[in-house]
Amino acid sequence: ELSPARGVSVRPRVPPEPLTIPDLHAQAVRGDERIVVAGMGPAGLFCALYLAEAGLRPLVVERGAAVDERLAAIESFNAGGALDTAANVQFGEGGAGTFSDGKLTTGTKSTHIRHVLEAFVQAGAPAEILWQAKPHIGTDKLPDVVKNIRERIISAGGEVRFLTRLADVEMASGQVRAVVLEDSRTGARETVP
């Protein structure tokens, strides 16, 4: 019998529960109505991905910039440049953790986490995250991984708008009627039913 390698922690294999994304094309939203996902952190990315793969063409709005623009703004700031309030370590594609160390703080005991980890691997994360007790993508890989997930959302019919803030939600009779979007840099507003 083999003993575990020194310093290596391995997660026991738990069979994943089936995760079926229904094809909802037949039940698509009416007319020009859209499902709006606010934010492109991990929750927003995966919400948009599953909605897009179900055929619902989500509109994803992110108050910050795309990951490449964020990276350029962060490098400029670190070199003594001004803080870009729309493109920085806090806001933008991938969320606040995109430029952290790339460790995934996940509920690894959840049987659904496997689906998330597999999506990360399909998007370019190292395959080892599928069995590591403490999955780690790495700061060097995470920006490309989130870009690849964005491309999957778009290729499945979703739309992504960066530098766009969810400014207001218009309600009528207890139901959402529209959202008000605001350009993060100019303040220009648009109402989306």
List the model feature ranges, each with a label.
Residues 69, 75-160, 164-165:
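Conserved N-terminal/central alpha/beta ligand/cofactor-binding core
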Residues 1-33:
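Extreme N-terminal leader/targeting segments of oxidoreductases
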Residues 50-51:
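Aromatic pocket-lining residues of Rossmann-like dinucleotide-binding sites
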Residues 64:
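Residues in the short beta-alpha loop(s) of Rossmann-like NAD(P)-binding domains
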Residues 28-43, 59-61:
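Beta1/beta-strand and adjacent pyrophosphate-binding region of the FAD-binding site
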Residues 31, 185-193:
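Core beta-strand elements of the Rossmann-like FAD/NAD(P) dinucleotide-binding domain
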Residues 162-177:
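A conserved short coil-to-beta-strand element within the FAD-binding core of flavoproteins
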Residues 179-183:
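Short beta-strand segments that buttress and anchor functional surface loops
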